[in-house]
């Protein structure tokens, strides 16, 4: 059985985002169409379903780096801000988006809080991600036969 570590992250996040659309607890907040993802961004996200991709990305990040807290995730999703003539400066991403994503993953039973440490993936969440990774790996093996040896 393949795990999250065995498949490319971008393909996995895309698949997980599609699967999360069918989970009733995961849905974009009312304000999602109107917000930037952080201080460092100039524009809103272009994709209409960007919320599911961010939740899937946060889910994968908690799986790989867990236990992880909101501040560390804010740093991960942050970036450099173009300040005109002034030198560029790093800014963290918005905390509300990450917080709401983690709360929705908790409500779905995929993530749980560990007091003083952050959040970790539950066995249900690990199973959810590993099943998607296994399906994805089988498809990749059909396209690229050399991957079967791994």
UniProtKB/Swiss-Prot annotation:
Which Gene Ontology biological process is one annotated for this entry?
ribosomal small subunit assembly
Instruction: Please indicate if the UniProt record lists Transit peptide as a keyword.
Output: no
Q: Which UniProt keywords apply?
A: Ribonucleoprotein, Ribosomal protein
Q: Which GO terms describe its molecular function?
A: RNA binding; structural constituent of ribosome
What Gene Ontology terms describe where this protein resides (cellular component)? cytosolic small ribosomal subunit
HAMAP family in the record = Ribosomal_eS19 (MF_01474)
Role summary: May be involved in maturation of the 30S ribosomal subunit.
Q: How does it assemble?
A: Part of the 30S ribosomal subunit.
Which protein family is it in? Belongs to the eukaryotic ribosomal protein eS19 family.
Q: What is this protein called?
A: Small ribosomal subunit protein eS19
